[in-house]
Amino acid sequence: IIVTQTMKGLDIQKVAGTWHSLAMAASDISLLDAQSAPLRVYVEELKPTPEGNLEILLQKWENGECAQKKIIAEKTKIPAVFKIDALNENKVLVLDTDYKKYLLFCMENSAEPEQSLACQCLVRTPEVDNEALEKFDKALKALPMHIRLAFNPTQLEGQCHV
């Protein structure tokens, strides 16, 4: 699975702040289908570090409750691509963002045999943004996605979107 479309000229400092996971999609149904599925994570905040890395604060359902997690995504030579060692994934790719309203990103595991890909549409405010969702769906067209979830504003406000 190769994600080719990444954001050109990403300014990582501008993605700082609060975000909400409005929609998610994955290459394999089992990555997202259950509340506690491996890549069913809910982004809360992105914090660029002075070194150009990215701290991702998120929530994930574990052992019957909503747990807080922090992932450090290390910068690479490509501004929109980061290395991670978490959630069984090894890369975070920023596909597109306007910094003010939406951000589209994917998490990828390029290692055989369990190649996987999960992408999310993040929004700044807990509202449904149809324009952002359209961009998300357009970006997904080129990718082998088999499950897609979207959340309503009430879910966006809740812990782990419950």
Swiss-Prot record:
Q: Where in the cell is it found?
A: Secreted
Give the record's PTM text.
Answer: Alternate disulfide bonds occur in equal amounts.
Top-level taxon: Eukaryota
Kindly indicate whether the keyword Disulfide bond belongs to this entry.
yes
Swiss-Prot/TrEMBL keywords: Disulfide bond, Milk protein, Retinol-binding, Secreted, Transport
SUPFAM superfamilies noted in UniProt: Lipocalins
Q: Which InterPro entries match?
A: Blactoglobulin, Calycin, Lipocalin, Lipocalin_CS, Lipocln_cytosolic_FA-bd_dom
Functional description taken from the UniProt entry: Lactoglobulin is the primary component of whey, it binds retinol and is probably involved in the transport of that molecule.
Family affiliation: Belongs to the calycin superfamily. Lipocalin family.
Report the protein name in the record. Beta-lactoglobulin
The species this protein belongs to is: Ovis aries musimon
